């Protein structure tokens, strides 16, 4: 049935002949590339884009995808949960988007809340990918879904219970239930036993507790950098919290009621501090530049195993028949011009069906920007060094992220660009916090000087004080 669909029916618009796929996470690209070439006609143009979970929002806003594969880790971090929610919200705008969720075996049965159309447990085999493609071509490529009535056995059900589907699918997904329940390739099984449910609940509880402790640890590390340096002060969590309480009390006493009202209003307007917690914005490392060699790596092995996709880049794949049986071909990435309006530079390639080759890349390491005198003063008496982990994958793996004009705070050609080698990481958050408190003290001092006579000098703090 699937191979009868013409090129005009592929994608979201008739006659488009193009399929856009997004792989979020460390997806199994070998199976996907081989399945794309096998199941789609030779005239179909396939665009594969690989990205991490941090750039899902940017990619969804700038592009329209047909199939999105989200592969999560065994810990199911907050960033991955946020990416799943973004993809789910994107399905409301693009009804022809298929969301495939690839989860570890230990998390099987606990993905219904993320609204995935199809969920698979690892490993992601070629058979599972083919099932996803067949399902998308059957139910997501109709260009006039609003005016077309599906047969009764394939209607869309929005209120199917979890127990009926073995807890593998969402209750509000686009689902042809009769077909899916009779399709053994989807791996639908009976509901989990009470022992398995208990193990899964215990694992999820420990995962949430681990995330909570990581949040506490991250906040304490930020407090250590924001607090004034005191020689001999303990650095454990309890001591840092106690020192923070004392410091906040001193700051509140030094601020005028008008400024305190402004601070209170700003905190109340911040949705992060509301009862309904928003996802934490985790640290996004700066992009890194890379250098390309002119040499090429050629091979005559299986085309499925030789296709290597670049991190955060796209590949346009054309299925072609090798002329004369010669085992030659090339996958040559062409870097796009960097501009402020560009969001993702796509590498477009022509891929023959018999051989592949890939340009080699140098491994790069993260660098940082210069430290201004103002920021250096904010770090006075502090001996803190910050290092970003180097990224040095092999040629056959993903390369580090490239410097992008939209993601880099400065132009790549500027000497102040944070992606330029030879600079240090700027402690912007620490300097900004110090400048805020200094601004509060200055404003408070001006209010008191205008309305009150000069006050007596304040007594010096005792030796036992933290400050």
From Swiss-Prot:
Domain bHLH per the UniProt entry, residue ranges: 200-251
Q: Chief subcellular site?
A: nucleus
- Report the induction information: Up-regulated in mice lacking Sohlh1.
Name the Gene Ontology biological process terms.
cell differentiation; oocyte differentiation; positive regulation of transcription by RNA polymerase II; primary ovarian follicle growth; regulation of gene expression; spermatogenesis
Q: Where is the composition biased (Low complexity)?
A: 443-453
Q: Which Gene3D superfamilies does its entry note?
A: Helix-loop-helix DNA-binding domain
Found in which tissues?
A: Preferentially expressed in the adult ovary and testis. Expressed in the majority of spermatogonia in adult animals, but not in the most undifferentiated spermatogonial population.
Q: Does the keyword tRNA processing apply?
A: no
Any keyword Cytoplasm?
yes
A Pfam match is HLH
Q: Where is this region: Disordered?
A: 443-467
Annotated localization: Nucleus; Cytoplasm
Q: What happens when the gene is disrupted?
A: Knockout mice are infertile. Infertility could not be rescued by SOHLH1 or SOHLH2 transgene expression due to a lack of expression of either genes in rescued animals.
The organism's superkingdom is given as Eukaryota
Database matches in InterPro entries: bHLH_dom, HLH_DNA-bd_sf, TCFL5/SOLH1/2
* GO cellular component terms listed in the entry, alphabetical order: cytoplasm; nucleus
For this protein, the record's CDD domains field holds: bHLH_SOHLH1_2
GO MF terms listed in the record are: DNA-binding transcription activator activity, RNA polymerase II-specific; identical protein binding; protein heterodimerization activity; protein homodimerization activity; RNA polymerase II transcription regulatory region sequence-specific DNA binding
Keywords, ordered alphabetically: Cytoplasm, Developmental protein, Differentiation, DNA-binding, Nucleus, Oogenesis, Spermatogenesis, Transcription, Transcription regulation
Q: How does it assemble?
A: Forms both hetero- and homodimers with SOHLH1.
Q: What does this protein do?
A: Transcription regulator of both male and female germline differentiation. Suppresses genes involved in spermatogonial stem cells maintenance, and induces genes important for spermatogonial differentiation. Coordinates oocyte differentiation without affecting meiosis I.
The molecule here is called Spermatogenesis- and oogenesis-specific basic helix-loop-helix-containing protein 2
Instruction: Record the organism.
Output: Mus musculus
């Amino acid at each position: 049935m699937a191979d009868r669909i013409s090129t005009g029916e592929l994608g979201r618009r008739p006659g488009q002949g193009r399929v856009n796929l997004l792989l979020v996470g460390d997806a199994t690209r070998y199976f996907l590339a081989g399945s794309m070439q096998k199941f789609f006609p030779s005239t179909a143009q396939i665009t594969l884009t690989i990205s991490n979970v941090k750039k899902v929002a940017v990619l969804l806003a700038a592009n329209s995808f047909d199939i999105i594969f989200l592969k999560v880790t065994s810990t199911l971090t907050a960033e991955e949960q946020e990416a799943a929610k973004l993809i789910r919200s994107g399905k409301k705008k693009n009804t022809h988007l298929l969301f495939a969720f690839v989860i570890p075996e230990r998390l099987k049965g606990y993905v219904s809340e993320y609204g995935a159309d199809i969920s698979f447990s690892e490993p992601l085999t070629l058979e599972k990918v083919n099932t996803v493609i067949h399902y998308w071509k059957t139910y997501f490529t109709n260009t006039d879904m609003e005016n077309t009535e599906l047969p009764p056995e394939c209607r869309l059900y929005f209120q199917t219970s979890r127990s009926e589907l073995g807890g593998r699918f969402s209750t509000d997904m686009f689902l042809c239930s009769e077909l899916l329940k009779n399709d053994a390739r989807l791996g639908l099984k009976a509901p989990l036993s009470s022992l398995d449910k208990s193990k899964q609940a215990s694992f999820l509880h420990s995962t949430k507790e681990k995330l909570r402790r990581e949040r506490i640890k991250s906040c304490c590390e930020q407090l250590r950098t924001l607090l004034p340096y005191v020689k001999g002060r303990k650095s454990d969590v309890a001591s840092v919290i106690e020192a923070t309480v004392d410091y906040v009390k001193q700051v509140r006493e030094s601020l005028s009621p008008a400024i305190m009202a402004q601070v209170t209003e700003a905190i109340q307007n911040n949705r992060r501090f509301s009862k309904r917690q928003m996802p934490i914005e985790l640290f996004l490392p700066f992009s890194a530049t890379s250098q390309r060699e002119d040499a090429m790596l050629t091979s005559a092995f299986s085309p499925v195993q030789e296709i290597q996709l670049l991190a955060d880049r796209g590949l346009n794949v054309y299925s072609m028949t090798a002329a004369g049986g010669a085992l030659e071909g090339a996958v040559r990435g062409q870097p796009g011009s960097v501009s402020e309006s560009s969001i993702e530079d796509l590498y477009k390639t022509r891929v023959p069906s018999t051989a592949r080759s890939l340009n080699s890349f140098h491994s790069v390491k993260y660098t940082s920007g210069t430290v201004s005198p103002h920021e250096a003063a904010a770090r006075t008496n502090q001996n803190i060094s910050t290092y970003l982990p180097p990224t040095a994958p092999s040629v056959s793996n993903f390369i580090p992220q490239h410097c992008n004009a939209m993601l880099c705070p400065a132009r790549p050609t500027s000497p102040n660009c944070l992606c330029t080698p030879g600079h240090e990481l700027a402690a912007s958050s620490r300097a900004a916090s110090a400048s805020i408190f200094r601004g509060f003290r200055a404003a408070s001092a001006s209010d008191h000087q205008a309305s009150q006579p000069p006050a007596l000098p304040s007594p010096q703090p005792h030796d036992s004080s933290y400050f």
